[in-house]
Amino acid sequence: MAAANWRTLKKLDAHIPILPDAVHTANPDSEDVWVYADLRQYVQIMRENHIERAVIMPFNDPFLMSMEFTAGAVHRNLAEMKRRYPGRFYAFADIDVRNSRAETVDALCRAIDDHALDGIKLHPNNSGLALDSDYNCAIFAFAQERRVPVAVHSYPNAEDDLSAAKRIVKTAEEAAEIAYENAVALLG
């Protein structure tokens, strides 16, 4: 069997950070890497590289994904990005650890019900919360109840890291229904 040509092979990008236009507009002099996290630029990259769909992932830091600095604003921005390019993007809901567990679960419910977001993104190193914390366990319980996938951004560097392998295994075992039926994606 001949090897596939990577350029023409159809692809799914499972983890792309894209900043909303409002953030780019508010920071016109930005010269960091995020200046390239632009939706229109990325759609062109998708066309050039036969990326059929992509998953837009937030950061668990609403200061990067909105100018209102709330999870609700992030969710509206993510929904708008999906709306602009129907059928091209999935988008995962964000969390804001400044909110209580109950407020976060309510925000996730609205993100899925009102904004048609497709899953939940957890980034323990950005949120400062261990993957197996009570806070995140409430999120996993919600995801299991609602049958939505959870993506975990993980780059554990130490045994006790917030996203250490033992925490991932423990969480996957405790949320086995999600892990095996709805998929827990590990990103890193």
Predicted regions and their residues:
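Acidic-enriched, low-complexity/disordered segments with a strong bias for Aspartate over Glutamate
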Residues: 13, 21, 29-32, 38, ...
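Mid-to-C-terminal alpha-helical segments outside catalytic/metal-binding sites
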Residues: 1-14, 18, 23-53, 158-188
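Divalent metal-dependent hydrolysis catalytic cores, especially in the metallo-beta-lactamase
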Residues: 29-66, 88-96, 118-119, 125
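Active-site gating/metal-coordination segments in enzymes
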Residues: 68-157
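Active-site micro-motifs of SAM-dependent methyltransferase domains
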Residues: 18-20, 61, 97, 127, ...
